[in-house]
Every structure is written in structure tokens, then in C-alpha cells.
């Protein structure tokens, strides 16, 4: 059966916009470009205090998305927890991530869940519900092998990774390898932008750092810049327009992107499409599916001295920088929307 109508389901955190929001925006646009009547379904999601989690999941379960105003909906695409709780006879999931605080982030500094009795009970309940709701899906896909590995490890569910290109894929281009390092990430604890900031204390004075992004940890990162002694060489650009970001990528030396256990890491592919090497960390998760140490970037310890050492190599050898950047570009150009759309629509 041909798929003519699709709803893409997303959670919304008001005033916050990141990779998941861009993914949904792109998916809707790509489906419409192929003649598929597509719309998005959004509900706010609040995960704090913890007793808000299950009611917000229940809100999605109350939704019957099989039709709208008498018009049949052929397919729904769920993305993040708890969008896959929605009801539809032809539901597929392209999973960005589950509620990570109860899974791989549990008992780490990035989660408010630990081994307390109430935490364990709620965690077990969320995991059981996830397994039940995801089992309803006619197709189970993820945005990366990293996310697929988590699904298999924690829920025993097999899935297929579907990689997608960044929003600005057609605009990103190389200009020159300038004397500034770029960081593009929300300023949140798990993004570890402070590693890039603290690395500046170990780099020569002709190199600068431009930090793109905003978030709840901005003050923390700014204090790290002050403590580094290199704050005069660090610019906090905040959230910037697409055109401004394209321009920053064009003439950067490289991208430093060292999050903790990232789901995907669109900034990696953005940098590659601008022929910029990427420096990431050995525990950065999804970025390691793209960054090949010594081939298109460097994989280092999550330590400012190690980050600085990788940047220094690129600064000292611009021919190496160009070679790594070209290899990254070639890899990024193999990732297209056609594969994603074909797989999702195969469940008509």
C-alpha cells in the first residue's frame, strides 16, 4: 500500500532546540518534497520531578492517530521517548533516544537516577513500558549504531541504524584553515564544552576558540574560560543563524566535539561537509561511528591536554589538516535522505 499521509511525532521542551528538533524538521520537509502529506505532532515533555515522567508518557498513550478529521493516516513515525506510546496500527520508530537517565546514564553524573528504591522501581517501570510500546512498532530504526546497541543491551530489541545528513548539507563548504577552533554544541553538562575551553590554556596564543551554542551550563563554561587564563582568545557566540554557522565552519581549523556518549552528533557531519577534521573523545558515543583516528580526525582521551595536543598537530601541519578534512568530506557525502525515506515508507 502506498503511503500518502504521515505524522511525525516529537516531544517538545519549550525554548530548547537541538539535534532532535532539527531531525524532525528535516524529516517532515523531505517527506513533503516527495509528495507525501506530512505533519508533526508535538507534546511538551517534562521529566522533573521524576513523578512527571509516567503522566507525560500516558498523555502520548491517549493519542489515537489513526485518522484526522475523517482522513486516514497511513503511517506515524515516532522519534524520542515517549512518542512511541502513541496508538496507530502502522507505527514505526526512528529512535533518537529513550529516556537516557534511566538507561546508560543511570548512576552517572549526568542522571538524577540512582540505586534508591523509588528510582529502581520507576526505572523498571519505564523500561518495561518501553519494551511493550516499541514491540508495537512495525519497523524499529535508530539514528545510529550507538542507539541500536543500547536498545539491544537494555531491552533485547534488534533495530537498524538509519543515518541522516545535517540540515545545512548543501550550504556547507570549505574556505580555508584559519586560526580558530570551533565548538558547536548546546552548553549542557554532557556536552563537555569545558574540555575545549580548558584546552586553550595549552595552545599557542595565535589560536582562538569560537563556542557556538547556549544552554543551562553556559555560566559554568564561561567560568572555565576565565579560569583557563585564555578567556581573551575565547568567544561565546551563543545561538547563531544558519548562515553564520556556515561561515564559521568555512574557515575553521577544526571542530572540537567531545560530548559524553552522544546519540549521533550532527556537528561531526557538518564539520566534515566543510572539510574540517573533527577531534572527539574515546567515550563520545555516536561520533565514533564517523571519526576515524588519524584518517579524518583524532580520537583522544576526554582531557583538555589531550584535546590541545590534537589541535596542535593540525595547527602545525596544515597539509595533514587538509588530508583529514577531505577524507571527512568524502564520508559525509555518502549519507543521504533517500535511504531514510525509502526504509520508513516501506512499511505502507
What are these regions (language model features)?
Residues 111-112, 116-140:
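Membrane-proximal helix-turn-helix segments that form the acceptor-binding/catalytic region
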Residues 172-191, 197-204, 210:
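Conserved donor-binding/catalytic core segment of Leloir-type glycosyltransferases
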Residues 222-240:
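Nucleotide-activated donor-binding/catalytic signature segment of Leloir-type glycosyltransferases, i.e.
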Residues 239-240, 247-252:
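Short alpha-helical donor nucleotide-sugar binding micro-motif in glycosyltransferases
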Residues 260:
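Aromatic "clamp/platform" in nucleotide-sugar-dependent glycosyltransferases that forms part
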Residues 277-281:
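Short hydrophobic beta-strand element within catalytic cores of glycosyltransferases
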Residues 293-305, 313-318:
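Conserved acidic donor-binding segment of nucleotide-sugar-dependent glycosyltransferases
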Residues 313, 320-334:
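A short, well-ordered alpha-helix in the C-terminal region of glycosyltransferases
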Amino acid at each position: 500500500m502506498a503511503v500518502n499521509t504521515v505524522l511525525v511525532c516529537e516531544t517538545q521542551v519549550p525554548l530548547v532546540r537541538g539535534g532532535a528538533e532539527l531531525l524532525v524538521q528535516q524529516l517532515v520537509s523531505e517527506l513533503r518534497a516527495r509528495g507525501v502529506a506530512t505533519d508533526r505532532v508535538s507534546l511538551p515533555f517534562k521529566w522533573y520531578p521524576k513523578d512527571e515522567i509516567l503522566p507525560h508518557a500516558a498523555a502520548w498513550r491517549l493519542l489515537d492517530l489513526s485518522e484526522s478529521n475523517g482522513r486516514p493516516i497511513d503511517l506515524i513515525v515516532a522519534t524520542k521517548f515517549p512518542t512511541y506510546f502513541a496508538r496507530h496500527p502502522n507505527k514505526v520508530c526512528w529512535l533518537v533516544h529513550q529516556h537516557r537517565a534511566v538507561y546508560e546514564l543511570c548512576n552517572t553524573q549526568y542522571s538524577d537516577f540512582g540505586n534508591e528504591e523509588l528510582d529502581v522501581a520507576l526505572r523498571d517501570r519505564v523500561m518495561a513500558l518501553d519494551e511493550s510500546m516499541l514491540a508495537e512498532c512495525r519497523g524499529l530504526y535508530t539514528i545510529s549504531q550507538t542507539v541500536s546497541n543500547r536498545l539491544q543491551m537494555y531491552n533485547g530489541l534488534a533495530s537498524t541504524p538509519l543515518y541522516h545528513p545535517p540540515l545545512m548539507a548543501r550550504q556547507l563548504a570549505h574556505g580555508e584553515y584559519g586560526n580558530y577552533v570551533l565548538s558547536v554544541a548546546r552548553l549542557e553538562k554532557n556536552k563537555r564544552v569545558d574540555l575545549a575551553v580548558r584546552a586553550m590554556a595549552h595552545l599557542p596564543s595565535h589560536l582562538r576558540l569560537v563556542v557556538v551554542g547556549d544552554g543551562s551550563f553556559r555560566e559554568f563554561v564561561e567560568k572555565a574560560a576565565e579560569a583557563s587564563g585564555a578567556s581573551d582568545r575565547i568567544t561565546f557566540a551563543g545561538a547563531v543563524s544558519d548562515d553564520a554557522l556556515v561561515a564559521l565552519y568555512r574557515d575553521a581549523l577544526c571542530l572540537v566535539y567531545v560530548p559524553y556518549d552522544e546519540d549521533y552528533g550532527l556537528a561531526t557531519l557538518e564539520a566534515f561537509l566543510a572539510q574540517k577534521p573533527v577531534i572527539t573523545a574515546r567515550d563520545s558515543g555516536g561520533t565514533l561511528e564517523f571519526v576515524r583516528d588519524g584518517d579524518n580526525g583524532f580520537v583522544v582521551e576526554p582531557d583538555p591536554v589531550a584535546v590541545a595536543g590534537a589541535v596542535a598537530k593540525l595547527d602545525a601541519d596544515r597539509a595533514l589538516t587538509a588530508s583529514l578534512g577531505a577524507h571527512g568530506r568524502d564520508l559525509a557525502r555518502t549519507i543521504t535522505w533517500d535511504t531514510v525515506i525509502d526504509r520508513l515508507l516501506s512499511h505502507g
